[in-house]
Structures are given as C-alpha cells and as structure tokens.
Design a protein with these regions (language model features):
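A flexible loop/linker signature enriched in serine peptidases of the S9 family
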Residues: 20-21, 39-45, 60-64, 77-89, ...
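Beta-propeller domains with acidic blade repeats across secreted/periplasmic ectodomains
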Residues: 56-57
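Blade-terminus and WD-like Trp-Asp/Gly-His loop motifs, strongest in beta-propeller folds
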Residues: 30-33, 67-75, 111-118, 156-164
C-alpha cells in the first residue's frame, strides 16, 4: 500500500503523454486537392488537407489498402480482401458502397489510374509457374482487364499525361533501407509507351 500513491502519480503524468502522441499507424496516403485518404485499422479514412476529424469511408470486415484518387478526384480505387479474395474496388470519394471490378482468384493490387480513367493494378494472374507480376488496367465500369505493354512489373504507375510508365520490374524479398546500394536495390525503370524504350 505504501507504493500506491507513487503509482497513482506516475499514471497521472503518463496518461496525458499517451494521449498527446495521437493516432499511429496511418498508412498509404493518397492526396487530392482538398482531401487525404489513408488506411487505418484496415479501413479507408478521409480527412481535409487543412486537418480536422477523419471520416471512415469503408466499414467492411475485410482488409482495405492501396487507395488512389482518380484524376478528377471523384473516385477512389483501392485493393480489398473481402471473403478471402484480394481484388480491385472503387468507391465514390464522398463514401458509399464499394464496387468490385476484378474477379480473378489471384491477388490484384491497385497501383493508380490511367489518364483515361482506367484503374491500373498488378497481378500474377498470367504468370504460372513463376508468379511474376504484370501490370493491367480495367475499365471504371468493369469488364475484362487488359495487360499493359511491359512484360513484368511489381510496382508502378502511369504518368499523368499517359506517355510513360515508371515501374519496378521484380518484387523484393525484404524491405530496403534508405540509401541501400546492394543487390536487393530495386531499380526504377521508365518506359515510353509509344516507342517501348
């Protein structure tokens, strides 16, 4: 009992410090002219660029990740794992019901948008037995995905004018350290979509 006042005093000083640290593990932000959408607790959240309270956009029990605003900022494409499958979904930027765009049993991971409003994603759907990823695009309305002109890509995005693709050709087995120059360094390749060079 003689230590009880000490622990009460310690707790009284530690509690405000814990609250002052704020929310942690906000991940994968995508930024528009007015808003920021990010992943927290496996859901998508949206907040004004000026700050304020964040609003939850998705509430499904699944895992949402990799949000990307469309170029007109009216839609958000994201990857979600609902009912055990990882696919591409879109949702209005103001919130609403997610719409599923891909149906392949392999994982489909959103990378961005084309200037024409198609969603770009990576998948290993055509690469058996090596599991090499390729980039695909799918219409905003849905339909069959179409492979992009590069043979393999683990991560990448199309330039805003649609003329170039910047990508990393292979996945890494371990996250890299900043300024790392060893054999696991991931080169970024840039390809002109017209000349294929």
């Amino acid at each position: 009992m003689k230590y009880l006042p000490f622990f009460i005093l310690l707790f009284a000083f530690a509690l405000p410090e814990a609250n002052a640290q704020g929310t942690r593990l906000l991940r994968q932000p995508t930024i528009s002219s007015e808003s920021i959408v990010f992943v927290y607790a496996n859901d998508l959240w949206k907040v004004s660029r000026q700050g304020g309270d964040a609003v939850r956009l998705t509430t499904d029990e699944g895992h949402e990740s990799l949000p990307h605003f469309s170029h007109d900022e009216n839609w958000i494409a994201f990857t979600a794992q609902y009912e055990g499958n990882t696919d591409v979904y879109i949702i209005p930027a103001e919130g609403g019901s997610p719409k599923r765009l891909t149906w392949h049993p392999g994982g489909d991971y959103v990378q961005g948008w084309t200037p024409e409003g198609e969603i770009v994603f990576r998948s290993s759907r055509e690469s058996r037995p090596t599991q090499t990823n390729k980039m695909y695009k799918v219409s905003f309305e849905g339909g069959l995905p179409e492979a992009l002109e590069i043979p393999r890509a683990a991560f990448g995005e199309i330039s805003p004018d649609g003329e170039y693709i910047a990508y990393v050709p292979i996945t890494f087995w371990d996250p890299e350290w900043r300024n790392y120059r060893g054999g696991q360094a991931m080169p970024i390749w840039i390809v002109d979509r017209k000349t294929k060079e």
